[in-house]
Amino acid sequence: MNWSRLREILDYETGILFGQTIEEIELAVMKYVSEYRDAVLVNNVMDEIRRTVTKPWTLMEICGGQTHAIVRYGIDQLLPPEIELVHGPGCPVCVTPLELIDKALIIASQPDVIFCSYGDMLRVPGSGRDLFSVKAAGGDVRIVYSPLDAVEIARENPEKQVVFFAIGFETTAPPNVMSVLQARSLGLTNYSILVSHVRVPPAINAILSSPTSRVQGFLLAGHVCAVMGYHEYPLLVDRYQIPMVVTGFEPLDIVQGILETVKLLEQGKVEISNPYARVVTYEGNIAAQEHIAQVFEECDRKWRGIGTIPMSGWQLKPEFDAFNAERKFDVGEIKAEESSLCIAGQILQGMNKPQGCPAFGTLCTPEHPLGATMVSSEGACAAYYRYGRVTINV
């Protein structure tokens, strides 16, 4: 086993294991991961859900990581028929707008650029191609596991412009912010980020304000709340009179989140609950929030397949324009249209499921995706395809 990689993963996931020994990490795995995949414990909670539910309820898990866990472990198939889970827009790759991907393709194609990105983004289709196509055509496109890796590449290649594709929700904002601060402290003028950061609370507001919304309760994204806390959500709970429950990503976390949501609904309680307290606090990570506020400011942001949601994104503050790839590489305005066959926007808003798409598994596959929900490791369509959850009509 790659222990250094495991340490990195656990540090990122829980935020509590920095500097621990291998033996301590092994114990932490047992405590924080293994028991939360225990089939007996999961079935016990499932039994309690069955005893509790008396009415039909529609719940939305907001995060793509939760969606994959639900489909992978068959959680939705074990639930009583009264409970329907619909999938939310919490997949950062899936909601990155087509126009910004096209800008990334233009920037990455320039001969003096090293374009760095997480691996998922390389296969997301733009209007006509993807970043893998740029790489195949000779562009210097590199997969990195951290924006700090991109900063190091910029330090080692002063003659090149290094651009990091900074996508994601609140969870990935702190390392992206730190990359900018580190580049500034190192005096690097050849590092910039192409920003497509989005925020969860405005997305939930947009979903619930739609007259077509069927969502009666939310499973909030635990990792987002680990960074930002959950102090922004009581306002939404009060406004729309629905319960919200902070939920983790392991099977036991998810069924506990479902149970807590169902209990609140059955009791007619409108409140927010946090059964994921081993990771999440009400305030969140204050230091991370302060760094985000130092570098980013809120802005309107377009979500792929959904449209523009007011104040749902972050952009670099003007004093950090030197690190703004959109300003450094003025590629102008780009207009792009989605495939008319792709219903990813409906899926991301919980209005449909992958099996409702006529292109699923035929015209749209992971090898030849029409939309980002079939590409991303957190996309709902990719989860359904990978785990064989849909009968394909041909």
Task: Name every feature range the model reports, one short phrase each.
Residues 215-277:
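A conserved active-site cap/scaffold subdomain adjacent to cofactor or substrate pockets
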Residues 85-87, 139-147, 185-202, 216-219, ...:
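Short, acidic/small-residue loops that bind anionic groups at enzyme active sites
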Residues 56-59, 190-191, 268-277, 303-304, ...:
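Flexible, glycine/charged-enriched surface loops at secondary-structure junctions
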